[in-house]
Amino acid sequence: MSQPDAAYEVFNYTLEKNITIDAPVNNAGFGDFGNFWEVDAQRQTDLLQVNIMTLVQLTRYFLPGMVERRHGSVLNLSSVAAFSAGPRMCLYYASKEFVRSFSEAVAEEVRSTGVTVTALCPGPTATGFEQAAQMKNSHMFSMFKPASAAAVAEAGFRAAQKGKTLRYCGWPTHTVSIAARLLPRSVCRRFMMKVNG
């Protein structure tokens, strides 16, 4: 998914095999840990491609057919990270804020078409993300008990089926999203700096 033509290859495969997609789930993504200027530049480019561009392109390729059929749901994986700046994981947090905002906007655009778009915003999830992002100095997974991947998937499925635009997973995630809106942004940034180590 980190290649610029990855989304087109997926879309073209469905055309070649005559597969109709009416419920795409855009859940590919990854994070990286460290100060912005110290993280590998190619890894940062790949993160932006996977977390933002491929998700946008897949949505763009599949949405017209869904709108034409007046049926379907798009489920985009955002994160509780979408509600705050994330020092030491700045591109990941920014990418998830993009996904949330993008999903909400497109959801409104398609509101009268029979198609829904849902942004799923889980907190820490037991998927191997922590190891892949090299978060050994982060306190995120020790401060917040990770949800199971199955529970997050179930929450996303149910939200998409109900046509929800935004879905939080669990009370800690909902609490963090509320706190991020009520507290000064400087307080949120400092808190996330401590959480991220």
Regions found by a protein language model. Name each.
Residues 35-36, 43-45:
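Substrate-binding pocket helix/loop in short-chain dehydrogenase/reductase
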Residues 37, 86-90:
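Active-site loop immediately N-terminal to the catalytic Tyr-X3-Lys motif
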Residues 1-9, 41:
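The beta1-alpha1 cofactor-binding region of Rossmann-like NAD(H)/NADP(H)-dependent oxidoreductases
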